[in-house]
């Protein structure tokens, strides 16, 4: 359900609540892999192994083409940059400075390609 997905993914913005850690769109890819491939049996190491392999392959592809999976690195920020928990206003000027929309599209594209290759869609 769209509303549930939006609620679950809201904290992903800004590299997990503006902490500038793993990019939210990368985390979103990983969630989709879990939905497509995972199961609810935590003792099933075969499934877990396959999910982890897929996550690592997607992360490597994203990093290879974009230089990182870390938000602050993708944005060109220094590690010691102090970020507020208050999100910036989303204006046209804001989006001109951010690669986020393009990275979201890129992640969706490689995820779709991967899911097709694995016959999951």
Where on the chain are the PLM-derived regions?
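Acidic-glycine-rich active-site phosphate/pyrophosphate-binding loop
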Residues: 1-11, 80-85
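A short glycine/serine-rich beta->alpha loop
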Residues: 12-21, 92-98
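DPxDG-like acidic metal-binding loop motif
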Residues: 28-38
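FAD-binding core of FAD-dependent oxidoreductases
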Residues: 20-30
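Short amphipathic alpha-helical segments
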Residues: 6-10, 30, 105
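Amphipathic alpha-helical interface segments
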Residues: 32-33, 43-121
């Amino acid at each position: 359900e769209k509303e549930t997905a939006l609620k679950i993914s809201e904290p992903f913005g800004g590299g997990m609540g503006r902490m500038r850690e793993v990019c939210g769109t990368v985390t979103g890819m990983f969630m989709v892999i879990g939905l497509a491939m995972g199961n609810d049996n935590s003792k099933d190491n075969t499934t877990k192994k396959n999910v982890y392999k897929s996550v690592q392959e997607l992360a490597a592809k994203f990093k290879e083409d974009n230089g990182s999976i870390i938000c602050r690195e993708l944005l060109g920020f220094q590690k010691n940059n102090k970020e507020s928990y208050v999100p910036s206003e989303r204006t046209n000027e804001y989006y001109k400075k951010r690669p986020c929309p393009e990275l979201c599209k890129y992640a969706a594209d490689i995820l779709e390609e991967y899911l097709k290759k694995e016959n999951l869609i």
